[in-house]
Design a protein with these regions (language model features):
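Short acidic-glycine-tyrosine-enriched beta hairpin
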Residues: 76-91, 220-236
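A short hydrophobic beta-strand segment most commonly corresponding to one strand
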Residues: 62, 88, 102-121, 232, ...
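Asparagine-centered strand-capping/turn motif at beta-strand->loop junctions
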Residues: 98-101, 242-244
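A structural feature that tracks compact, well-ordered secondary-structure segments
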Residues: 42-44, 110, 185-188, 197, ...
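Glycine- and acidic-residue-biased ligand/ion/polar-headgroup-sensing regions
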Residues: 59-70, 75, 203-215, 219
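A short, N-terminal "cap"/entry segment at the start of jelly-roll beta-barrel domains
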Residues: 1-38, 118-182, 266-280
Length: 280
């Protein structure tokens, strides 16, 4: 199962923040409605002077600012977030958002487990004790694309060998090493000619493209996706990516749940070679 779309063609509303926000719009890229059982992926916006009331969630959340400026309020602190800043918010932590600038602010938001179950997973409250065991209610960082290493094969992820990946670089910016337990959020970049061959996973992946264009093979469909496009691949859905352009392509990618310690990907070519060995 897979899904793809374009941000400008995706409907916007306040979603679960209706009545608890002003100047807030959310474009849902991935959620239960398209078949996901693990994650919600959203591009959200706050108009100048807009705000989202204090609340807490029964899921983990990460926000990556695309443009504009956000005031993030969490655990009694206020953080100013600008383009390419990102924040991880632990489950059960009260937080709020404001746009105190004179321009709209936009960000990518990933939440897991997938919101909208039988549990009341978003609660609006001005304050609440931290959950037991939470030492860092939220964490903030800045991503600098210039700090990415040179593209290569393998990309540093378990099971992604050089025969199946080339001209690529990936950096996990939110994951187990930064306090998240439910998902990985990555920045991925392919040089011209960069590729990953046909494969699947035991986890879902979501993609939001920031720069350039890529040929995406999703199941039996092949499409060219560009900045502002997005796609999603379910557990067991075969997919491949190739940069056939003359420029770099870069995107934000989610992996939900976090991948296993081994066999993070099953590559078609690897398996076909294995079963073709003499004696099989």
């Amino acid at each position: 199962m897979h899904h793809r779309g374009n941000l400008s063609e995706t409907p916007a509303d306040a979603g679960r923040y209706a009545g608890h926000s002003t100047g807030h719009a959310r474009r849902v890229l991935v959620d239960k409605g398209i078949g996901s059982v693990h994650q919600e992926l959203v591009v959200a916006e706050l108009e100048p002077g807009g705000s989202v009331d204090s609340h807490l969630h029964a899921f983990e959340e990460a926000c990556y600012v695309l443009e504009g400026a956000l005031a993030f309020e969490g655990d009694g602190w206020t953080e100013e977030l600008g383009a390419d800043d990102y924040v991880f918010v632990d489950r059960g932590v009260v937080h709020a958002l404001r746009n105190v600038s004179d321009a709209p602010a936009r960000w990518v938001e990933v939440s897991a487990p997938v919101p909208g179950g039988a549990l009341e997973d978003t609660v609006f409250t001005a304050s609440h004790p931290l959950p037991e065991g939470v030492e860092h209610p939220y964490r903030k960082w800045h991503f600098d694309v210039a700090a990415l290493p040179e593209p290569s094969g393998g990309i540093g992820l378990a099971g992604f060998g050089a025969a199946n990946v080339g001209g690529a670089v990936a950096k996990i910016i939110v994951g187990a090493d930064t306090g998240a337990s439910q998902f990985n959020l990555m920045v991925v970049q392919y040089a011209p000619g960069g590729f990953i061959t046909r494969h699947d996973h035991a986890f879902e992946e979501g993609f939001f493209f920031l720069e350039g264009e890529i040929e995406a093979e999703l199941g039996d469909e092949t499409s060219t996706l560009r900045a502002g496009d997005y796609c999603w691949s379910s557990v067991g859905d075969m997919h491949a990516l190739t940069n056939r352009s003359d420029g770099v392509v870069r995107w934000l990618e989610t992996q939900v749940p976090q991948p296993p310690s081994r066999y993070q990907a099953r590559f078609t070519a690897d398996w076909e070679r294995f079963v073709a060995q003499p004696g099989s």
